[in-house]
Amino acid sequence: MAYENIILEKEEKLAVLYINRPKAMNALNKDTLLEIKDAVTAVNDDPAVELLIITGSGDKSFVAGADIAFMQNLSAMEAREFGALGQKVFRLIEAMEKPVIAAVNGFALGGGCELAMCCDFRIAASNAKFGQPEVGLGITPGFGGTQRLPRLVGPGMAKQLLYTADVINADEAFRIGLVNKVVQPEELLPEVKKIAGRILSKGQLAVRLSKAAANEGMQTDIDRAMSIEADAFGLCFATQDQKEGMTAFLEKRKANFISK
């Protein structure tokens, strides 16, 4: 698929997906969502890539939201279908086997905040802005904001942000737990790639099983969640990576993981 609204770059075991609609502040329309879906599927299916970073082109906007010009004249049925598409694409990102990090540069509003939230975690530039401003447009969030925001920052803070349409800066996003770290804009991608490097130096089968256990466990009761973790723990002991990791530890050397 030829991309017009995104850029997908690969650097050894790492892929970087840029939302690339600078004239529209990287806003999301239907075509952009379909391109993201294609790229994410390709990354997940590529055995050479083990981690994905999602960011926005330029330094002003991660994703400014869903494209209001595109949405303005949608019928109720068309709007529901557009929301369902966004939910499906973001759920695909969330459910990827491989780790996904959001490198948030500039505005992450509405659909942009929702895109960041479906990633495993978020690192923000100091100029980043977050919010779900939809009620100010007479609509609700449509790409998962009412569901993921309470899970990340708690229901009280989430409802305040949802009801007021307040936009918060990167430091406040860090304070409430929406982002893991705030860095200067010029340090954003280098810092995220540094974190990615630390992840990639570990056993990737174990990383993926850890992600799956965490994601699945949050959707069920604690007893079922513990069983999911036990299954993941047991599976690790059928891998070459477990044998290599423990042998390397005992021999006081760096492990050479092969994802098998």
UniProtKB/Swiss-Prot annotation:
Entry GO terms, CC: cytoplasm
Catalytic activity: 3-hydroxybutanoyl-CoA = (2E)-butenoyl-CoA + H2O; a short-chain (3S)-3-hydroxyacyl-CoA = a short-chain (2E)-enoyl-CoA + H2O
Pathway noted in the entry: Lipid metabolism; butanoate metabolism
Gene Ontology molecular function terms on file: crotonyl-CoA hydratase activity
EC number, UniProt record: 4.2.1.150
InterPro entries reported for this sequence: ClpP/crotonase-like_dom_sf (IPR029045), Enoyl-CoA_hyd/isom_CS (IPR018376), Enoyl-CoA_hydra/iso (IPR001753), Enoyl-CoA_hydra_C (IPR014748)
EC class: lyase
Highest taxon in the source lineage: Bacteria
Cleaved signal peptide residues: none
Keywords of this entry: Cytoplasm, Fatty acid metabolism, Lipid metabolism, Lyase
Active site residues per record: 114 (nucleophile), 134 (proton acceptor)
Pfam families linked: ECH_1 (PF00378)
Induction field: Highly expressed during syntrophic growth with butyrate (at protein level). Seems to be constitutively expressed.
Places the protein is found: Cytoplasm
Gene Ontology biological process terms from the UniProt entry: butyrate metabolic process; fatty acid beta-oxidation
Subunit structure and binding partners: Homotetramer.
Family under the similarity heading: Belongs to the enoyl-CoA hydratase/isomerase family.
PANTHER family: ENOYL-COA HYDRATASE, MITOCHONDRIAL, ENOYL-COA HYDRATASE-RELATED
Cited function: Involved in syntrophic growth of S.wolfei with butyrate, as part of the butyrate oxidation pathway. Probably catalyzes the hydration of crotonyl-CoA to 3-hydroxybutyryl-CoA.
The protein, known as: Crotonyl-CoA hydratase
